[in-house]
Amino acid sequence: MTEPLRIVFAGTPEFAAEHLKALLDSPYQIVAVYTQPDRPAGRGQKLMPSPVKQLALENDIPVLQPPTLRNAEAQAELAALKPDLMVVVAYGLILPQAVLDIPRLGCINSHASLLPRWRGAAPIQRAVQAGDAQSGVTVMRMEAGLDTGPMLLKVSTPISAEDTGGSLHDRLAEMGPPAVLQAIEGLAAGTLEGEVQDDSLATYAHKLNKDEARIDWSRPAVELERLVRAFNPWPICHSSLNGEALKVLAATLAEGKGAPGEILGASKDGLIVACGEQALCLTRLQLPGGKALNFSDLFNSRREKFAIGTVLGQTADAQ
């Protein structure tokens, strides 16, 4: 009877934890988990373990959290695990060539885009922001470059006009694990060939930045509507209203002309705000100290705040 493959898993956020769950339910042996060091989170800024670390500890899997894999000590620690394969999903650390060379079958990565489009840190949100018609998961063999390795397997899904960064994330987190298991099976059997990426088609998905979430009302409404969806649930698009922060969680396209940021109308259907081209109808908002509400609820209780002619974003936006 052949021994099960010895797999080292490396990942950090919830997207990665979904992949680890599938591997823990597989016939493979997960010998260790690598994840980012605990980070301060929440109002108290307490050190919090990553979702991957929490799952590993619940299943009695050894957890390693080196700040880097570039030094000889960290590489020797990995080599001592004698891995057949390393599976990497949204880990957040660069793997140098010396690490990629350690596992017998190499290292594979599950990336949340249809490579070579959207290499980099935020492929899900950038796909929604760009108005892409589809997204997916690519399982690739890792190289020293960022998301540049040969593609072993791809699965795709349409991006709907209602998709947010959150809804697309959740869908891809379901699609990725079966694709990884299929790729492992093919690699172990020696039946899977990699397809070289066409670098001329590559685009880069820059890391999300809170400053990007500040709404510039001079931009076309079609761009802002996609931005609102892409940045939900994080970092959430925002503006200001009479000097107060205003978070925008949902919006639709609307007709109307006016100065960028000018309130053109308000009803239970939403708050109509002029943009550089067309207008946005803001349908879900959050005011300071309150919870996110549909605009119909705000309109009933705070109608006076949304006077026609008021201009959003005139003062410095709160973070």
Curated annotation (Swiss-Prot):
Catalysed reaction, written as an equation: L-methionyl-tRNA(fMet) + (6R)-10-formyltetrahydrofolate = N-formyl-L-methionyl-tRNA(fMet) + (6S)-5,6,7,8-tetrahydrofolate + H(+)
InterPro entries per record: Fmt, Formyl_trans_C, Formyl_trans_C_sf, Formyl_transf_N, Formyl_transf_N_sf, Formyl_transferase-like_C_sf, GART_AS, Met-tRNA-FMT_C
Assigned protein family: Belongs to the Fmt family.
GO annotations of cellular component type: cytosol
Binding site for (6S)-5,6,7,8-tetrahydrofolate: S113, L114, L115, P116
Gene that encodes it: fmt
Keyword Protein biosynthesis on entry: yes
Gene Ontology molecular function terms on file: methionyl-tRNA formyltransferase activity
Function: Attaches a formyl group to the free amino group of methionyl-tRNA(fMet). The formyl group appears to play a dual role in the initiator identity of N-formylmethionyl-tRNA by promoting its recognition by IF2 and preventing the misappropriation of this tRNA by the elongation apparatus.
Name of protein: Methionyl-tRNA formyltransferase
Species whose genome carries this gene: Pseudomonas fluorescens (strain ATCC BAA-477 / NRRL B-23932 / Pf-5)
Broad EC category: transferase
